Amino acid sequence: MDYRITDFGAVVSDALQTEAIQKAIDTCFLAGGGRVVIPAGAFRTGCIRLRSNVTLYLESGAILEGSWDPDDYCSYLQDTLEPLDLDAPRHPSRSVDPFSRWNNGLIKAINAKNIAIIGEPGSYLDGVNCYDPTGEEKYRGPHMINIHNCENIYLEGYTIRRSANWAHNICRSQNITCRKVAVYGGHDGFDIRTCDHTLIEDCIFHTGDDCVAGFDNHDVVIRNCDLNCACNVFRFSGADVLIENCNAFSPARFGHRWTLSDQEKAARIETTSESRHTTGPAFAHYCDFRAEIRRAPGNILVRNCEFSGMDILYQMTFGDHVWCCNRPMTQIKFQDCKFTGIWQPSTIHGSAEEPIVFELENVEVSAREGYEDIAFMDLRDFKTISLENVTLHNFTNPRILTRTEGEITGNSAANFPVEPYQES
């Protein structure tokens, strides 16, 4: 059954429509589920809580526009229909605590099953770059979609713009499908942490931060996506991960908003030509201590992808940064991929306890003009580097620098002089 928000009092207005939209969701939930329909028009809202068996459906021309006031995203904490236990012990990390201000979102789901957000072409979720001087980095506001401890999540068709923090922040959830979703501007495009069985396909993530991020994820497929960002294309780890048929390119359309001035952030400016528009690694390993990593990160295959203009092919600096200090990558393979415009060596610093197996097969790599003399790799605590049918362009001395011993093998290995790393 459909529940149109206009039947519950929602109108196109500068005034907040949060109460009317939430009433439609609650009525649908109490009736056993159905669709809550957002018709064409711009409806301004604070946080709305999505509940079990409810589909939020945006018709063509529908816009859910966030409030400019970050305090308007806290109302779910006073929910009386499904009260939250705010007195229970809470995790000290703001990003782990689902009730923290950092975890606010325009659309919030907690402990729900069978939820969906579906948008027809031409439907939008607009985060308005909501400015929060008490938020992360003293300017980030709520996420667009914030989901914790949920099962059976279906996302399709809508476009997100100007998300005040991550466009999708999904934690401790299972069975996630995201299809034909577009994200423009804002921060990260899609973040998952401690999630199982995730499919992301046919999406566009053109963001001001990472495209896809997260760790402690099992059984993930990412395919047929168009990727453009001002940070890492993939800042990710997990077990049993397939990334295929994706295209990533740089420079970024939207600069990293952290590089805006304080005045520009407060004015909710999207981007400027002076912002940082470069893209770092195509793939950076991610593994901090906000989650107990359940399985060794590995069995990751990246195949039939093209990366143009990234600074680095791969980066893992295990133990050197707070975001890379929990469990190292143990195995990753790039197959039938092309990298153009690289200007820094792949830094592969693993763990002596769990050394990495890193594989390139049928891979083409070109160095950026002006950086022809860069090393190809900088290695530490590795088990095996396998180089099969690796073709290089514009490298004058594609050496591999080693800090510890390990095996370098494959039919292309002879093309890479191996030298001990020396501090400059």
What are these regions (language model features)?
Residues 1-424:
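Extracellular/periplasmic carbohydrate-active domains that bind, remodel
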